[in-house]
Design a protein with these regions (language model features):
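A Zn2+-metalloprotease active-site environment signal
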Residues: 146-151
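Conserved alpha-helical "signature site"
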Residues: 1-145, 159-222
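GAF sensory/regulatory domain recognition
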Residues: 152-157
Length: 222
């Protein structure tokens, strides 16, 4: 099973951010190297969660208004959906990412409304929303019958964890956790991905609020 590699732009951004080189012009130049990521970033910050800052005309404006680390989180999220590709089950793959983006947007709005209570920021919620089921495409690639067995093309249905384990000896939550770790996501977001179907196993944990937000977003989307 091959974990998708991170785009070069993302690696360059991470190096700059980790060195605390927060020159907005330099960061914007790196992001602008990838027109696809840039377009997706503008689409995300067009959400009502960032209504206080809109409209944005440049990536520099986004970095100034939203924040460097927050923008980096958003870039990570949009990069994932364009990092891999699949030849078979193309329709199911596209439906999967449409669902993930919708849940990410809902999670972002929920976090924006509940930030004083949950202490989860919109960019973090969007990142978790996009990544929460990211193990699914890898299992689609690994197992030719995964889509059919998990009924991914059936409206209103989603993956049954017990059936997934029984038929494929796999857990998309664990696979997603490994992807998140490989992409160097914050630890509490990695844990939220791992336990987003088992919130009770987290106990008193900072990922618990994130799981609650993602699950509410899933319920609203359903």
């Amino acid at each position: 099973m091959k974990i998708p590699s991170q785009p070069r732009v993302l690696n360059e951004l991470r190096k700059l951010v980790s060195r605390n080189e927060l020159d907005v012009r330099a960061l914007a130049r790196v992001i602008n190297q990838d027109p696809g990521l840039t377009a997706l970033l503008f689409k995300v910050v067009g959400s009502s969660a960032y209504r206080k800052h809109q409209p944005f005309a440049t990536v520099e404006e986004i970095l100034h208004a939203v924040g460097v680390e927050q923008t980096f989180n958003l870039v990570q999220a949009v990069a994932l959906s364009s990092a891999g590709s699949i030849e078979k089950n193309r329709m199911a793959y596209e439906v999967f990412w449409a669902r993930s983006h919708a849940i990410g947007q809902l999670a972002m709005l929920i976090a924006d409304e509940r930030i004083a209570v949950c202490n989860i920021f919109p960019d973090q919620a969007y990142l978790a929303g996009i990544f929460h089921d990211c193990g699914v495409p890898l299992l689609m690639q690994r197992f030719p019958t995964y889509c059919a067995e998990m009924k991914l093309g059936v409206h209103g249905t989603w993956i049954d964890l017990a059936e997934e384990d029984k038929k494929f000896n796999a857990d998309h939550c664990v696979v997603g956790y490994l992807v998140a770790r490989h992409w160097c996501l914050p630890e509490f977001i990695c844990d939220a991905i791992r336990y987003h179907h088992a919130i009770s196993e987290l106990g008193v944990h900072e990922a618990r609020s994130m799981v609650a937000i993602v699950q509410l977003a899933i319920d609203i989307h359903s």
